[in-house]
Amino acid sequence: MNDHQTITGIYPGTFDPVTFGHLDIVERACNIVDKLIISAAENIHKKPFFTIDERVSMIKESLKLINTNKCLSEVVGFDNLLVDHAKRFNAKVIIRGLRAVADFEYEFQMAGMNSKLAPDVETIFLMASENLQLTSARFVKEIAFHSG
């Protein structure tokens, strides 16, 4: 008798653009969850270079570069509260990537608020792989903008 319950995780981000750092987190998250919903956020506090539809398309295309065979994955956009988005997919886990201590303060506060709003949804932090700790979408955009 198999009583394994499917674990669904949400990996939210702006993904403007998606980077190898993001893909590293996706690949590693697939070792933890059975299904991963990669969710491009429409964030009113950020002014993304790419539209949400472009970001969703880029993520889907980028997933071809990595092994996601360990879990089912789906790519969607969202513009509501993360915990409401997680509930929509019956996700029990929010996956967040951390590059450095500077990321932790913000992520810690967000995880605390999400826990208050949805106590049954856990946040899991994955540290960036050592070779990707300096990768950031902001730097990628800046280099591309200056034809680097």
Which residues does each predicted region cover?
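Nucleotidyltransferase catalytic core that binds NTPs
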Residues: M1-G148
